[in-house]
């Protein structure tokens, strides 16, 4: 199948007005979304690799995919390795795409890409590298993978266009009219005549609307253009539900217009002509640097005016606004994590009971049962991503996704079971990983489990200067693993949206800096998730969501009392852990814990029990309560 698809794509490459020596197939859609709808799953269709990150390059004789360490094992399972080459982009010896193209193509080669699927910040350095090598990067407006699909009788599915739903201010904490007013103030500071919002979660956040066009992500396909006296939404056919119009009116949004989703490029051309004809040279268009090359070109009027408008291309102010949650959003996060904790605790109690009784439970059945428990909780809207239920060796596949077709993996009593899951609630988003052994862990498993836990506790208890970049904390999580020559091939933490995308930029914790990271500040939500993966045997990951808080000597934080300064006025910040599910006591090697770590884990388990216990008691879930009490008993040294 992959050979047939590659052959069709290569034929289209050769038939272009200028034959293409290489064609690039990114993962992202026209909005640079991490998670995409089936209509945009082009890299998956041509390569067979289903991971959520990676870029394919196809030439006349080679086919390659660059992806990171989360997906090495998955790629080797899914792709036809006789046709496709894995480029391990996290490794120092792997050339990046630009280096590979300039080293392997002939001088004068033409490289093509759909300009809707590549951002300006990706396009520019690639174009520069190719030009230096006397090669050319060209936009190919009709996506060649889509064309190949049609030729093979496998046309892409229709683009989803579900009506968005209002999210009331008692969840959001700020009306959309206020958000637009703040953005217009920032536009005035930049002397921008228009601001183009291209990221789907940014449109949803700005208008306080949520959608269902991409599975697990409450967003809807749209663009938003904010001008001094108007706000234009491009969505669907341009018809907006009455409930949405009434919502926006109540939220103080004036000058609102709705247009067809496909009209955004013609509108940008028209706007560029209008502003260019004024001829005063004072008009700039502001858009995020991760907006597509196609939108950048249209916004500048590059193809329709003699002198293109200047563009302000930098991190989106909406991204920076939604990064810092307001108090209503933060309280929503705290509350939904309590309800989510109840659901996850009930699930693990059920799973252990089933395994101890000798029942046959597959990974898929476990994932489905967890959703059932979450459905019992108020304001649950669905999972926040596809559950990762890795039993045994599958736990070592970092972003494992079991197939519902064919033979199912059964969870056995001698398995280490890694469960990474999350929920979308109207008041917040959760993401939690717990690793539990279904029977008795080996000494090696206990050692790895404890080292990963020590790393998570080192991050969770850290104090650091306000505004420090997330990469500074990454080595804290790896310290105990590094001491014995172990590591993990993913970042330590990502931002999380408020009833939005479970992965949210521009901040995070990784070994390399996030390019637009404004620094860690109170009000941000991050994950704290170190891990260890022994390929072919087991995987371990501990993941909590944490809220960044300001810390003084009087703050409820385990290290607050030891403060003697505030970083010369910068301010001290730390983390408050939101996730409330115990870690498995029998997997912890107590001899490896410091006194501080032992107190920390016991205090955490005490808080879990004191928070969730009364809820289970009130609901009459006494067996679940008894299980939680056992799991949260204090840990002592022998």
Residue ranges and their predicted role:
Residues 1-638:
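Active-site neighborhoods and metal-handling regions in enzymes and metal-associated proteins
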């Amino acid at each position: 199948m992959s050979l047939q698809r590659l052959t069709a794509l290569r034929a289209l490459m050769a038939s272009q007005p200028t034959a293409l020596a290489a064609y690039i197939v990114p993962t992202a859609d026209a909005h640079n979304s991490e998670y995409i709808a089936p209509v945009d799953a082009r890299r998956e269709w041509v390569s067979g690799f289903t991971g959520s990150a990676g870029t394919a390059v196809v030439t006349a004789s080679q086919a390659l995919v660059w992806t990171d360490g989360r997906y090495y094992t998955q790629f080797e399972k899914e792709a036809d390795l006789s046709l496709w080459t894995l480029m391990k982009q996290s490794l120092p010896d792997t050339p990046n795409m630009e280096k590979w193209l300039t080293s392997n193509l002939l001088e004068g080669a033409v490289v093509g890409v759909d300009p809707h699927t590549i951002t300006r910040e990706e396009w520019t350095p690639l174009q520069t590298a190719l030009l230096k090598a006397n090669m050319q990067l060209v936009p190919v407006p009709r996506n060649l993978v889509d064309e190949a699909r049609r030729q093979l009788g496998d046309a892409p599915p229709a683009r989803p266009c579900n009506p968005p739903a209002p999210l009331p201010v008692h969840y959001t904490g700020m009306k959309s009219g206020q958000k637009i007013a703040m953005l217009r103030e920032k536009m005035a500071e930049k002397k921008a005549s228009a601001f183009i919002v291209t990221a789907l979660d940014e449109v949803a956040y700005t208008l306080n609307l949520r959608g269902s066009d991409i599975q697990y992500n409450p967003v809807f396909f749209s663009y938003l253009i904010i001008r001094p006296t108007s706000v234009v939404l491009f969505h669907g056919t341009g018809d907006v539900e009455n409930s949405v119009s009434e919502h926006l009116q109540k939220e103080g949004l004036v000058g609102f217009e709705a247009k067809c989703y496909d009209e955004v490029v013609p509108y940008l051309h028209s706007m560029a002509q209008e502003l260019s004809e004024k001829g005063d040279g004072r008009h700039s268009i502001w858009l995020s640097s991760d907006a597509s090359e196609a939108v950048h070109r249209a916004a500048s009027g590059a193809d329709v005016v003699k002198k293109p408008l200047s563009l302000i291309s930098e991190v989106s102010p909406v991204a920076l606004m939604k990064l810092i949650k307001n108090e209503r959003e933060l309280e929503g996060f705290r509350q939904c994590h309590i309800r989510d904790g109840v659901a996850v605790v009930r699930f693990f109690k059920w799973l252990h009971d089933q395994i101890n009784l000798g029942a046959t439970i597959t990974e898929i059945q476990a994932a489905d049962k967890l959703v059932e428990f979450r459905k019992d909780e108020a304001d649950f809207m669905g999972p926040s991503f596809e559950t990762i239920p890795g039993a045994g060796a599958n736990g070592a596949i970092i972003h494992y996704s079991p197939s519902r077709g064919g033979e199912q993996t059964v969870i056995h009593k001698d398995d280490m079971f890694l469960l990474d899951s999350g929920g979308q609630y109207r008041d917040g988003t959760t993401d939690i990983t717990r690793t539990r052994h279904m029977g008795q862990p080996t000494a090696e498993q206990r050692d790895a489990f404890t080292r990963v836990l020590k790393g998570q506790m080192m991050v969770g208890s850290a104090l650091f200067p306000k505004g420090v970049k997330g990469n500074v904390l990454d080595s804290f999580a790896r310290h105990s693993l590094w001491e014995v020559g172990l590591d993990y091939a993913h970042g330590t933490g990502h931002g999380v949206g408020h009833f939005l995308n479970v992965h949210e930029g521009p901040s995070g914790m990784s070994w390399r800096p996030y390019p637009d990271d404004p620094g860690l500040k109170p009000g941000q939500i991050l994950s704290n998730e170190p891990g260890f993966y022994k390929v072919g045997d087991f995987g371990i990951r501990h993941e909590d969501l944490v809220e960044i808080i300001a810390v003084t000597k009087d703050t409820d934080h385990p290290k607050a009392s030891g403060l003697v300064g505030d970083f010369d006025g910068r301010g001290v910040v730390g983390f408050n852990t939101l996730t409330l599910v115990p870690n498995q006591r029998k997997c912890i090697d107590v001899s490896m814990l410091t006194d501080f770590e032992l107190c920390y884990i016991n205090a955490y388990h005490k808080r879990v029990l004191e928070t969730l216990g009364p809820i289970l008691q009130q609901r009459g879930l006494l067996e679940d309560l008894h299980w939680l009490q056992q799991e949260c008993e204090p840990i002592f040294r022998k």
